[in-house]
Amino acid sequence: MDRNILRSAREDPHRTATDIQMIISSPNEPVPSKRTVRRRLQQAGLHGRKPVKKPFISKKNRMARVAWAKAHLRWGRQEWAKHIWSDESKFNLFGSDGNSWVRRPVGSRYSPKYQCPTVKHGGGSVMVWGCFTSTSMGPLRRIQSIMDRFQYENIFETTMRPWALQNVGRGFVFQQDNDPKHTSLHVRSWFQRRHVHLLDWPSQSPDLNPIEHLWEELERRLGGIRASNADAKFNQLENAWKAIPMSVIHKLIDSMPRRCQAVIDANGYATKY
């Protein structure tokens, strides 16, 4: 019976104790209780845990991810020197979207000391666009209206390109994901007119973009500091952005071989990055 319980759980990790109980039931053997099933699984080290949420990746995109990872597996700082990494991110004015915990004595649930203040409608947020290279931090641009193809082009024309020419030089390679506004004809025409080279990028691959961890670094540096309004929040973000040392950037670029290897090992599925 124990062997059947473990086999059933390993065949499909999403099966519940009730599912396994029904699957292994046999007319010639007693039906194990759900408690027995759980105990056997725990003894074998198979504990029930909330699964990590990762985006679904199609077979076509998995193959493209593996191919890209293999092609760039051995690239280091020198190979990435002319590449500009970019992305957009949202930051809340009044804390994060995640769950928070508090340690409090029994009976003190409603004490102000142990409360987590909230603001109606979430308190607002600030959208930003940023970029960086292996040799320098790029600008952080505030997005104050709907981020469409026209504003995206404006960011390139007035912010990204002037900075890139001054800090990276001509012949830079720009990285972006495959969001529809990024790949629109309007934006593609701008790249062609300005002779900007694009890095071929596999869809559904945030784990290959090191800037994702730069957003986490920015959030960590703010340390939950609150802002009274959107202007104050952006000032906080910009100051923290400028204070990020190059040692952090170097670590992110140096992580690229590991990111690529992780994608290869996972056969294109989402990785821990």
From Swiss-Prot:
It comes from the Eukaryota. It is found in: Nucleus. Keywords: DNA integration, DNA recombination, DNA-binding, Endonuclease, Hydrolase, Nuclease, Nucleus, Transposable element. Pfam families: DDE_3, HTH_Tnp_Tc3_2. InterPro entries: RNaseH_sf (IPR036397), Tc1-like_DDE_dom (IPR038717), Transposase_5 (IPR052338), Transposase_Tc1-like (IPR002492). GO terms for biological process: DNA integration; DNA transposition. The N-terminal region of Tc1 transposase has strong affinity for double and single-stranded DNA. Probably essential for transposable element Tc1 transposition. The insertion of Tc1 is the main cause of spontaneous mutations. It is an endonuclease which can produce a single strand nick at the 5'-end of the transposon. This is Transposable element Tc1 transposase. It comes from Caenorhabditis elegans. The lineage of its organism: Eukaryota, Metazoa, Ecdysozoa, Nematoda, Chromadorea. The gene is tc1a.
